[in-house]
Amino acid sequence: MGIFALFAVLWTTLLVTSHAYVALPCCAIQASAASTLPLFFAVHSIHFADPNHCNGVCIAKLRSKTGDITVETCVNGFNLRSFLVAVVRRLGSWASQENLRLLWYLQRSLTAYTVGFNATTADSSIHNVNIIIISVGKAMNRTGSVSGSQTRAKSSSRRAHAGQKGK
């Protein structure tokens, strides 16, 4: 049970301490190669959007750090919740009260999302945001939601730049 128990405890700790926070702003799930996702041990928190937020779109954010920059990666909330339900259920009688509270939350939110599931709530692209990260003189384009020491919204920059051209 060794590594599996460590894995389950780590995920549960991350989720129980962070599931009360709403993932704001909402984000768009981007198709990505697995190699571009943060490594498991690089994820320092997971934030779920509740069913009454983000227009009912089931998303979650993985937060990881790269140097001084915290990167939030938008992921499919159904998949992550379902995976974690399976992990906590495998704990069986080893599940702590925190594990059981997490399981209750995950199952409740999955049920709520399933009831409201339709073409609109399946499309996270309405929350798409393009940003530029600027840190220590280096810029990096990324689609999604990112927070760091210095960030600037690309769409805001484009609007400001377009306004200057019109003068």
Swiss-Prot record:
<keyword id="KW-1168">Fusion of virus membrane with host membrane</keyword>
<keyword id="KW-1162">Viral penetration into host cytoplasm</keyword>
<keyword id="KW-0261">Viral envelope protein</keyword>
<dbReference type="GO" id="GO:0044177">
    <property type="term" value="C:host cell Golgi apparatus"/>
</dbReference>
<keyword id="KW-1040">Host Golgi apparatus</keyword>
<keyword id="KW-1169">Fusion of virus membrane with host cell membrane</keyword>
<keyword id="KW-0732">Signal</keyword>
<feature type="region of interest" description="Interaction with gH">
    <location>
        <begin position="18"/>
        <end position="131"/>
    </location>
</feature>
<feature type="signal peptide">
    <location>
        <begin position="1"/>
        <end position="20"/>
    </location>
</feature>
<comment type="subunit">
    <text>Interacts with glycoprotein H (gH); this interaction is necessary for the correct processing and cell surface expression of gH. The heterodimer gH/gL seems to interact with gB trimers during fusion. When in complex with gH, interacts with host EPHA2; this interaction triggers EPHA2 phosphorylation and endocytosis, allowing virus entry.</text>
</comment>
<dbReference type="GO" id="GO:0055036">
    <property type="term" value="C:virion membrane"/>
</dbReference>
<keyword id="KW-1160">Virus entry into host cell</keyword>
<dbReference type="InterPro" id="IPR038313">
    <property type="entry name" value="Herpes_gL_rhadinovirus_sf"/>
</dbReference>
<feature type="compositionally biased region" description="Basic residues">
    <location>
        <begin position="155"/>
        <end position="167"/>
    </location>
</feature>
<keyword id="KW-0946">Virion</keyword>
<dbReference type="GO" id="GO:0020002">
    <property type="term" value="C:host cell plasma membrane"/>
</dbReference>
<dbReference type="InterPro" id="IPR020175">
    <property type="entry name" value="Herpes_gL_rhadinovirus"/>
</dbReference>
<dbReference type="GO" id="GO:0019064">
    <property type="term" value="P:fusion of virus membrane with host plasma membrane"/>
</dbReference>
<dbReference type="Pfam" id="PF11108">
    <property type="entry name" value="Phage_glycop_gL"/>
</dbReference>
<protein>
    <recommendedName>
        <fullName>Envelope glycoprotein L</fullName>
    </recommendedName>
</protein>
<keyword id="KW-1032">Host cell membrane</keyword>
<feature type="compositionally biased region" description="Polar residues">
    <location>
        <begin position="142"/>
        <end position="154"/>
    </location>
</feature>
<keyword id="KW-0325">Glycoprotein</keyword>
<comment type="similarity">
    <text>Belongs to the herpesviridae glycoprotein L family.</text>
</comment>
<keyword id="KW-0472">Membrane</keyword>
<dbReference type="InterPro" id="IPR034708">
    <property type="entry name" value="HSV_GL_alphagamma"/>
</dbReference>
<dbReference type="GO" id="GO:0019031">
    <property type="term" value="C:viral envelope"/>
</dbReference>
<keyword id="KW-1043">Host membrane</keyword>
<comment type="function">
    <text>The heterodimer glycoprotein H-glycoprotein L is required for the fusion of viral and plasma membranes leading to virus entry into the host cell. Acts as a functional inhibitor of gH and maintains gH in an inhibited form. Upon binding to host integrins, gL dissociates from gH leading to activation of the viral fusion glycoproteins gB and gH. Targets heparan sulfate proteoglycans of the syndecan family as well as host EPHA2 to promote viral entry.</text>
</comment>
<feature type="region of interest" description="Disordered">
    <location>
        <begin position="142"/>
        <end position="167"/>
    </location>
</feature>
<dbReference type="GO" id="GO:0046718">
    <property type="term" value="P:symbiont entry into host cell"/>
</dbReference>
<dbReference type="GO" id="GO:0016020">
    <property type="term" value="C:membrane"/>
</dbReference>
